[in-house]
Each structure stands twice: as C-alpha cells, then as structure tokens.
A protein has these predicted regions:
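Phosphate-binding glycine-rich loop
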Residues: 25-72, 86-90, 96, 162
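N-terminal "arm"/small-domain region of PLP-dependent enzymes with the aminotransferase-like
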Residues: 1-25, 30, 344
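PLP-dependent aminotransferase class I/II
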Residues: 33-37, 42-48, 108, 120-124, ...
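Helix C-cap/helix->beta junction micro-motif
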Residues: 90, 142-143, 304
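Conserved PLP-anchoring active-site segment centered on the Schiff-base-forming lysine
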Residues: 59-114, 120
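Nucleotide-sugar donor-binding loop of glycosyltransferases
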Residues: 71, 77-79, 98, 151, ...
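Active-site phosphate-binding strand-loop segment of PLP-dependent enzymes
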Residues: 101-183, 188-190, 195
C-alpha cells in the first residue's frame, strides 16, 4: 500500500530521540528553545512558540488576539475541523466563507460576512498552496480585524519570494506525522509581534511565569500545551531535511502534473508560477460524472494498493455544527468536497511509485 502521505524517520532521527531521552530534562528545556529558534530562522519570523499540537496553537492564537464570547471568526469550511473548533473553544461564533476552485478561501466573498462583531479572519493554505494573504490582510486592516494564517499544510511554502508564516498577525504550523516535518504530534505559533508572543508563552504553560528563584506568578488562565524536548529533538533533525522533503514532493507532483495534463476524468490544482508549494496534498478533482461513484472509486483504489483520502468534508456538515448553526450550503465548498480525492504524494515515494498510482487511477476510472 502506498499511503497518501506518511512520515520519513531515519536512523539519525531515532538516534537524536534516544539521546534526548537520556537527558536530565525531558520537557521545557534547551531543545524546545533551540527548535523554536531554528524554525523562526527558517521561516523568517521573529517569534516561534512550539506547542503540543496545531490545535493548541490555534486555540492560543485566538486567545492571544482577545477573542471572547460574542466575537465572530470568519474561516473556511475546507479544512480540518480544528480551525473552527479552536475558535469555538475561545468563545467565538464561527462564520464559514465559501472557497475558490483551488480549495482556498475566496477572499472576494469575505466582505459580505464581516460585521461589527468580526474579530478574526482565519485563512488556510490548502494542501500547501498559499492563500491570497495580502488581499485578506488589506481587507482586514480596513475593518480593524486580525488575521490568522493556518499554515498547517504549508511549512516551507513560498509565495512571491516570501515564506509562508511571515505576513499574518499569527501563523500556525502542524507537525503531525503526515505534515512536511513531524514531532510525532506538535504545532507552532509564529508571529512578529512581541506582545502576542508573550501571551502565547503564558497560555502555553498555565498562565504562569517565573519571577525570581522559586517564585512565579499566574497572570492569566492558561493551559498545559507544552511540547517535550524529545519531540523537539526529532523536529530539529527533521527541519534540516525539510527543503529536501519539499523538493521530493514537488518532483512527484511535477510527474503527476505532466501525466494528468488534459486528463478526461479529472482536473488538478495548478500552482501559480510565483509559488512553491510544500505539496502537503496532491488533490485530483473528479469530473461530475464520477461524484456518485466516489466511494466505489475510493474502495477500488485501496484494494489495488493506492492509499487515498478526502480533504475535506466541509466543517459545517458535521452533526455538531449542524446542531450549532443549522443547515448551511456553500456551493463551491460542496462541489469541491464532491470532487476531491487526495492521491499519494510524499517524500517517501519514488517516481516509479507515482507511475503506479497514476496507472492504477486511470485503470479504476476507466472501468468504474
């Protein structure tokens, strides 16, 4: 089975993790701060605060921006549920904005959703393809709204020569095993704002900061969102290979792009010339004639050894959100969900693997 994505763990990764386990300090130590420092340097941002998950980092992002009961957050439904869930955890109401054909939030549809209660717009760089963040930031500034870039898919992505993670008030990265690098589980909060970074560090660790010697002060109600030194040792080792990971993913994606050009069964998402995507996902968008056969296609591919996935069921279609918000239908999000199928594209693959995936996909679609 070729999975749609997976981690790549080397002997060096295992060694640094084993070495970290032998250290006296297993959490809150130098490896955490070193990982934060190296990640900030890589992205080109002033502060990185590492946490135990991207969900934790999202929750802290909303809290640090002052999101509270009665505030509204605008975000995309084509994302993992945590993007919206974390806003609810902070007390906000969520308003979902429709997407474009590439799965990213449609910035042209955001203005109609803005009210005096809107506190934050949260964009998601779907599959590693950056959103039109400059347009979103310019819109937000006109209304006094803050912007979060949920870049969980996009560590290492570049747009107009600038790495993702620099422009928004806060950017979020994920280190889940299928993401560009892994710390087993983990996430990060990135910002150029000193005060937001100070608040994030407090929220990460119970709202407590040391004052002198043994003494400390709890100045706000925080959480235990700390990440371990063992996890960060793995993160440091993986970060050294990130550019190579992305290059390999792009090699596989380039093969697909060429192989699927003019395909009669589906379309692919074109990455703009000014962009280097992390290629966290390689989505194919099935033609409408296949939508009602998608489960059959999915099962057939799995049986033939091609691991596929769907990214994503619109968040508002979950029963929890239906009970909370009632029935919602955003036409482009619905179409995207009906069409989307993520095929294997990761740095553990060879071009021969990609050839097998492509030929198997064609075989299944021609016989369904």
């Amino acid at each position: 089975m070729i999975p749609y994505s997976r981690q790549q763990i080397t002997e060096e990764d295992i060694k640094v993790v084993a070495d970290a386990l032998r250290d006296d300090i297993l959490t809150g130590g130098e490896k955490v701060s070193k990982f934060e420092e190296e990640l900030a340097k890589y992205v080109g941002v002033k502060h990185v605060i590492a946490m135990n998950s991207a969900t934790s980092a999202l929750h802290v992002a909303y809290l640090s921006l002052g999101v509270k009961d009665g505030d509204e957050v605008i975000t995309t439904p084509i994302t993992f549920a945590a993007t919206a869930n974390a806003a609810l955890m902070a007390g906000a109401q969520v308003k979902f904005c429709d997407v474009k054909a590439n799965g990213n939030i449609d910035e042209e549809k955001i203005p109609a959703l803005i009210t005096p209660k809107t506190k934050v717009i949260t964009a998601v760089d779907y599959g590693g393809n950056p959103v039109e963040l400059d347009k979103i930031i310019n819109l937000a500034k006109k209304h006094g709204i803050k912007v979060i870039d949920d870049a969980s898919h996009a560590l290492g992505s570049v747009q107009n020569g600038v790495k993702v993670g620099v422009k928004a008030d806060i950017s979020i990265f994920s280190f889940h095993p299928v993401k560009p690098i892994t710390t087993l589980e983990g996430g990060a909060f990135a910002t150029n704002d000193d005060e937001l970074a100070r608040l994030a560090r407090l929220y990460r660790s119970h709202g407590i900061a040391k004052t002198k010697l043994w003494d400390s002060d709890m100045s706000l109600l925080g959480y235990n969102y700390r990440i371990t030194d063992v996890a960060c040792a793995l993160g440091l080792s993986q970060l050294k290979r990130l550019d190579g990971f992305i290059a390999k993913r792009n090699e596989i994606a380039k093969f697909y792009d060429e192989k699927f050009s003019g395909c009669e069964y589906f379309k692919t998402i074109k990455i703009p010339a000014n962009t280097t995507s992390s290629r966290h996902l390689y989505p194919v968008l099935l033609d409408e004639e296949f939508w009602d056969k998608k489960e059959q296609i999915f099962e057939a591919l799995l049986q033939k050894g091609v691991g596929v996935q769907v990214h994503y069921k619109p968040t508002y279609k979950f029963s929890f959100y239906k009970a909370l918000l009632g029935e919602i239908s955003l036409p482009n999000a619905e179409k995207f969900y009906s069409a989307e199928l993520s095929i294997p594209c990761h740095h553990g693959m060879s071009v021969d693997d990609a050839k097998f995936v492509a030929s198997t996909l064609f075989d299944v679609l021609s016989n369904v």
